[in-house]
């Protein structure tokens, strides 16, 4: 499948068009605006490997750069790679409701000192198994990022993302310091 959409900065209104494809367990995010860039997540490796393709070639995005913003938005490479989904020893923290839906709250802790997050709490829909929202914490257990699925769509019986809100949080006072939306159009089958 192929989906088009955009990342949009809430403060400036600036948007970055994107194309998202998934084929052979490789997810590709294509950004056409200058400088053009492709970020692809190869889920054939364990853990999944994040690559960046720019003029001059392709390279693995090093762990030390996972906290860098993608296209100047509040969405970073760690968010894009969803690397925290592969962290070992998830812990069930309880249950909650998100948009009226029952969810489990699952906490994962970063097994290394690399990356922007120390721990991540995920609200997982009990019905679909999909993530409804996420809160990420720094090494002092202060919230630094949260995102929430604000719209979903059905594709051949499966629930897929339509809109995601990503917020960066000031760990000192909990205030939102930046907000980006990822919006995706209806998927189209690859030829």
Language-model features and meaning:
Residues 101-190:
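Gly/Pro-enriched, hydrophobic low-complexity segments
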Residues 21-26, 42-46, 64-70, 150-153, ...:
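A short, sequence-level motif marking secondary-structure junctions
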Residues 3-5, 90-91, 147, 184:
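Generic structural motif
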Residues 3, 27, 90, 106, ...:
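Well-ordered beta-strand positions enriched in small/hydrophobic/aromatic, beta-favoring residues
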